[in-house]
């Protein structure tokens, strides 16, 4: 167990807990099977909210628990469950949270994974339904056998689960794999409870199967976009901006602290832009190099803390160049960013759809930087366009059709 799961050079200096939870119910994660759900169903594992404790609440089966808890095993074997990831992708790290399970937590666990096609998963596993107080039937065991989950690859070998504080017992595990996964199997030995299972990673899209006539969000975290640098994330990480679906609340966005270098009395230019010395920024590696044709900036829920203005720039970097930029906190004066969106005034609690009209948009980029002034929050950032490896796109201003190809030294999904 570790308190701060910071990653090293091999995984590009990222804190994996700031990545998307690929198994969460809010992105489509689904429990396919569990050996036993007596005290608490396995669906609790993939809830998006943190576990809670209700001291005086009981069910007809025992103490109410906010997690997956099996009965005390009195037959041979151990308990396990199978989860279909809501977003298929590369797993960077796993958090097995046993908060509030003092006296009942599973003492050991392991995690396996598989990359299954739709044909592989077309088994006759029946719908789960209401599971509390039940165990898997012989028919359900027979149906799940078709997945051959016992032979899946191990991401985490059998490991001891350790209790920490009653309300914060996280067990973090790094995953060193570049494979794409669609399903995971959580084994607990021999029985017990787990509050939450977080499977952190980045999505990975099948770009070859993409409809090349429609623009796609090239920075979406579900496809592999990721934040690789930022100036401030006091109230919310920039990765929230490229999350799945519509923002759910003010917590589901990027928000900075108030800048302390704000002038005592604010002044504005004729076009309404504040005259302030400072700004905040966040840099993203696109899910795939490409050409950006439309920019969407949503300030929903940011009513009294919306930035006054923003701009978006793009550039093209190799893997080594990106690592050099990270080491220098994205402050290398010699590096040239190209404008994708000039300084634009933002309106609170509103979605801004902005078509870029500059010739620079015909350049392929791998990274994008959003800069807000002076500070504040943004709920969603969408950079829509065409992937470089497959796009045949009609650029603006009636230029000839251009075909782009991926250069050596670039990575589409990391």
UniProtKB/Swiss-Prot annotation:
Single annotated GO MF: allantoicase activity
GO biological process, alphabetically ordered: allantoin catabolic process
InterPro entries cross-referenced by the UniProt entry: Allantoicase, Allantoicase_dom, Galactose-bd-like_sf
Domain of life: Eukaryota
Family, per entry: Belongs to the allantoicase family.
NCBIfam families in UniProt: allantoicase
Function, in words: The function of this enzyme is unclear as allantoicase activity is not known to exist in mammals.
Protein name: Probable inactive allantoicase
Gene it is expressed from: Allc
